[in-house]
Regions:
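N-terminal helix-turn-helix/winged-helix DNA-binding helices
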Residues: 23-56, 61
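Hydrophobic alpha-helical
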Residues: 105-125, 208-270
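Flexible loop/hinge segments that line or gate small-molecule binding clefts
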Residues: 112-152, 267-275
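N-terminal helix-turn-helix DNA-binding module of bacterial transcription factors
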Residues: 1-39
Length: 329
């Protein structure tokens, strides 16, 4: 006790022995008792997209809820501030809500690059530490990032799609319409990795971008009829976000079977498409664990000033197919 709290006289030899044992055991003070004594509440706000049941961000929210239970004993409260991922104005409003009464720390999913940059500048000016979830922007001030290595995931995806196969002259990349309008492009780094792989290994293959509105099924089918559906022979199709099930539904309804399809994330609808053979592979991640790790790291920083061991905390990329997907969820 005297060594830990610098109370009373301790010989140098004894102090060195105690400090050595502390280091070997990885001991840290009893935070629970200390924080109960301080009675100070801290708030971590998580700025994330709105979601429907079964969607990607539902799993992330589950991780945040699990983490909230773990850190609540230390006087830390977790609050989500949601925005419409298809509305830049909604994102601005969510950021303004945070800045109206700045919290102790912020986790943000940066769907809108320029607006996120403005937001984190304001956070820095207010002295609020922040971390990125799922994707990140070019910025020097973030405390940590928790998510896939985006560029490498795109490179991996291209290898899964093409490796050891006769590749057609054209590959269809299905993208959300917001990319084309320049509003938001959270998978830009993933797409860059994919494109670099193709340039290195299949420079003559044409990449055809197909933009869809995920909220308009009729428009999706019309667009895919004009592109994927109009092609004859073997077709390769890829999507860089969690909505490959939209393509799978189209292929099933149209009775199209000669497609190789690769997507991302283990949503139940995507897993169903894997089981049926409509989608051949998914690059998956345990997104709920990302959220838990991010909250725990922010809590350590707020409570002890403990820096994150790694600034970029890349979660592992798992390759799922119809034979192993049931053992992953």
């Amino acid at each position: 006790d005297r060594v830990l709290h610098n109370r009373g006289e301790v010989s140098r030899k004894s102090k060195e022995k105690v400090l050595k044992v502390i280091e070997e055991l990885g001991f840290r003070p009893n935070l629970y008792a200390s924080l109960l004594a301080s009675q100070k509440e801290r708030l971590i706000q998580c700025v994330i997209p709105e979601f429907q049941p079964g969607e990607f961000w539902k799993k992330k929210k589950k991780g945040l809820q699990d983490a909230a239970q773990l850190v609540s004993r230390y006087g830390i409260r977790i609050e989500t501030v949601k925005y419409d991922q298809y509305s830049v104005e909604s994102f601005r409003n969510a950021c303004s809500k945070v800045m109206d009464n700045p919290p102790s720390g912020v986790l943000v999913a940066p769907m809108y690059g320029e607006e996120t940059l403005k937001f984190v500048v304001r956070l820095s000016e207010a002295g609020v530490p922040y971390m990125f979830l799922d994707s990140k922007i070019d910025d020097d001030g973030y405390l940590a990032y928790f998510g896939m290595p985006m560029y490498q995931s795109g490179y991996l995806c291209a290898d899964i799609l093409t490796g050891g196969r006769d590749v057609p002259e054209k590959i269809y990349v299905v993208r959300i319409a917001r990319d084309k309008m320049g509003l938001s492009d959270p998978t830009a780094a993933r797409r860059a990795g994919f494109m670099d792989f193709m340039k290195e290994h299949y420079p003559d293959v044409q990449i055809d971008n197909v933009f869809i509105d995920p909220k308009d099924k009729a428009a999706i089918y019309t667009k895919l009829d004009q592109t994927v559906g109009a092609e004859k022979g073997k077709r390769f199709v890829v999507m860089f976000n969690s909505r490959i099930h939209l393509v799978a539904d189209y292929l099933t309804d149209r009775g199209i079977h000669d497609c190789r399809v690769v997507g991302f994330d283990c949503l139940e609808k995507n897993i169903e498409a894997l089981r049926s053979g409509t989608v051949q592979a998914l690059v998956a991640q345990h997104t709920d664990r990302q959220a838990v790790e991010a909250v725990n790291s922010m809590a350590d920083y707020l409570l002890m000033g403990k820096s994150v061991a790694k600034r970029d905390n890349f979660i592992q990329m798992d390759i799922l197919n119809r034979y192993n997907c049931d053992y992953y969820l």
